[in-house]
Amino acid sequence: MYYLFHQPLHFIVAGYLYLTGSALWESTAAAAEGLQYLSLFYVTTASVFAAFILRELRLPQKIFYAGILLFMFNPTLFLFSGYISDDTPAVMWSIIAVYFLFRWYKTEKSLYILAAAAGFGFGVLTKLSVLMAVPAIISLFLCKISTSEGKRTDIFADLCLFVIIAVPLSLGWVIRNHILYDMQFYNIPDTSPWGQNFKYQTLGERIFDFSQISKPFINAPTAVDANIWLAMIKTELFGEWDMSIGNVFIYVPAKLFYLLNIFLKICTVAGILYLLHQAATDKSSRNKPFVWFFIVLYITLWGYSFKYAMDYPYVCSTDYRLFAQLILPETAILCLCAARILRSGCRKSSFPTHIWQKAATNFLPVAALLYALLSAFIYVYGL
């Protein structure tokens, strides 16, 4: 009963794969190692569907390839490739669901809404945090309803189809455990080790303590990074350990990588503000529903991550692996913002404005290339 709070899908798949591997190799150790190939499959599939999603946004070519680099060279995905846990398939299923939702939005084919509902349902059956996509999904349906005056009956029918498939898949396990074992809907037992405790830190320290901003690494469980935002930025790149221990030459590129990541996070927030302004002034943008989708998803996931870190004040609660679903909306927001600036620059503008627009749109491909090179170097040389 202690582990009934876990959604079962990943563990069922991994369990049968483990039994199959044990029978084939006659070695439980080899079978356990073989589960890493399952994680690699999840990461590869997530990357392919993320590329499909970026293609659906009809980005300029150089912005599209910049998005590919930012997503596929995100170190969290490197860590996930050999990581046997439910976080990896949760990311995969959520990305698959987003892709088919976008295809449904463009084509209005019920087959795509069936696939999206299955992807979402399997995602929640893997990890409950996939439910954080619900507000973004609702925003997409609302955009579709508001722009389809003559087809609203069909849209409502597709919405009902989505609910009929997704809800039983998503909540069946939770309802079963509540009926049989009186389990709460969202129950996380306190399993964190003593050395990770942040519960005596004030709210101000959890948000505004930037005393550790100069250090790119966290070394759990002795970490002192009470700041939720910094901890997530660091663990996105390097996990919960100091990679420079035993390899001092990795510190300089890691520090540069860390500073670049902070800058990209700032650009993401600025990009949200810019896209909101553009959405309010330009009523004809074809990407507006997807802009709203990613902004709502990004804000929801960050809000959830903050609440989770405050409710469970431990180092592990700010580990980026728990919120890796942020990788896609962050990448998409940066790409949508750069594409918007590039397209506005194609119109007639003054000389200084044109120069600024050119610099802004060239920044993302250059930053993405540097991001990919640093990420690859650190994880090839640093490990």
Outline where the language-model segments fall.
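Transmembrane-helix signature of polytopic, membrane-embedded enzymes
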Residues: E26-A29, T45-F73, M92
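Specific aromatic-rich, kink-prone transmembrane helix
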Residues: F49, P89-K106, A118-F120, I333
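Short acidic/glycine- and proline-prone juxtamembrane loop motifs at membrane-interface regions
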Residues: T76-A90
